[in-house]
């Protein structure tokens, strides 16, 4: 059991992809005609021509996934042929493929008629006239999707040149994970010697078996292939960055991620140290891990919005209480002043009344004294008068 680096696909070599293209096309669903698809994948009573484009693509993806799963299952038991990469030129997945709204709602027959009418309106002759005579059942799925504009030729070429698949170039049964673009990372498990193959893009260092191995793309390959379009740089030049545990955590140690041990063990874990190298660094400098400088992320300032709101509410409540108390004191003071003024007025009225009463009592007493000094008047005695009323 050993670990080695496979750099066959780092330079973007398209010769191997072109060699595996016929085999890949023979095993792909997109090389089948609609009649063959109907006889192979079609359901009874349901024609592919009556399906919408969305439904057609969903059925193709389902069949492709099923084929890939069956191929993977069979590849574990028996090694595949040399250079066989099933699903290498597969269609883009639903997450990256968007159909036009007008095209997704049309059926396959309507799209086929529209393509024929469009070619007829352009006035093409010669070989195009022979192609227009071709029926939908004789048309391959790949040609139909290309003419409909669902699959671009650039995408198909990139998929054909991709090295991702379920069989490595050495013909051993295994499992390989790739990105679908040349010059990118791919990890494969070889079935013969149980080794791990890591196809890594230049510019990213890997720690394999406790050592750092750097893959650099030679400049001669770029000069030999000037006509090939270079893919965009996925891993730019980066500096060493170290992530350390926060200060408040109980475990304050740094965790490093390594890929030590056999290839069939669990690959890595949660790590706290991330190190990236640039294409300009030499392999001698990357033989061992450089001691990282820990960069501690602080907790940052906590949000005090809740506390500020509580303090603001208390201040507003205190201001309201003070204003209410001032208003109540003003009302009490005004009421007290009114009462005092009323008392003063009542006192004045009482004094006037007391003076009048004293004068009246004085005059009454003087009159009584004068009356008592006068002699009493004697009344005349009244006698009974004799009357002659009797008979005598």
UniProtKB/Swiss-Prot annotation:
Compositional bias per record (Polar residues), positions renumbered to this chain: 274-291
Annotated keywords: Abscisic acid signaling pathway, Activator, DNA-binding, Nucleus, Phosphoprotein, Transcription, Transcription regulation
One GO biological process term: abscisic acid-activated signaling pathway
GO cellular component: nucleus
Renumbered residue ranges of the record's region Disordered: 1-22, 266-297
Record-annotated bZIP domain positions: 311-374
Pfam families named in the record: bZIP_1 (PF00170)
Cell compartments where the protein resides: Nucleus
Induction notes from the record: Up-regulated by abscisic acid (ABA) and cold.
Keyword Nucleus recorded: yes
Residue span of region Basic motif: 313-332
Modifications after synthesis and translation: Phosphorylated by CPK4, CPK11, SRK2D and SRK2I in vitro.
Modified residues (Phosphoserine): 28, 50, 96
Modified residues (Phosphothreonine): 135
Residues covered by region (Leucine-zipper): 339-360
Main location: nucleus
Molecular function, one GO term: DNA binding
Subunit structure: DNA-binding heterodimer. Interacts with ABI3 and the AFP proteins AFP1, AFP2, AFP3 and AFP4.
Family of this protein: Belongs to the bZIP family. ABI5 subfamily.
Biological role: Binds to the ABA-responsive element (ABRE). Could participate in abscisic acid-regulated gene expression.
Protein name as it appears in the record: ABSCISIC ACID-INSENSITIVE 5-like protein 4
Origin species: Arabidopsis thaliana (Mouse-ear cress)
Gene: ABF1
